[in-house]
Amino acid sequence: MQQRNYQREMDALIASLDARPRLLLHSCCGPCSSACLERLAPHFDIDVFFYNPNILPAEEWEKRLFWQKHLLEMAPFGKDVGLIVPERDETAFRLAAAGLEAEAEGGARCTECFVLRLSRTAEAAREGGYDYFATTLTVSPHKNAPLINAIGEKLAEDHGVLWLPSDFKKRDGYRRSIELSHEYGLYRQSWCGCGLPENF
């Protein structure tokens, strides 16, 4: 079976737009969102949805939220972007990860974490009347873009809101996120949020 090119699908969808749809963009952190927002802001009215109960400990969550806000305040592509920050809800993540604490990054715990965060994003997109929802997670070379897109497409069906396919790491998206992080002085963490053993 031919592998899908999610980046090409997103480009084609954007090219077909005749208006500016509303997009709820799940963001894991400022650095990852930087290249995604730069690419999407010319075409969508965007609110960033910072829902990341997996980020442990709480001090790390606060730090990443601070740098997400900093990016939106400093970058020209962030000036018209809104920010929605639900409660951190660490309990929801610990329940989703129960029994999977020893899994390596990329394993079953990651899948459950994707489902948790994207489910909440899809719910918020439906409740808020957004046209699309998406995530910055596919900018990372460590994240499984086909899996993330499959989860997003299933949730789109379940919640009646459109999923924006993506593979933001393509077309040097990850490299661009590093460049923008340096440009705006962003804190770049070395792990996704939950992967350190002491967090469990």
Which role does the model predict for each range below?
Residues 1-38, 42-200:
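Nucleotide-activated chemistry modules centered on ATP-dependent adenylation/adenylyltransferase
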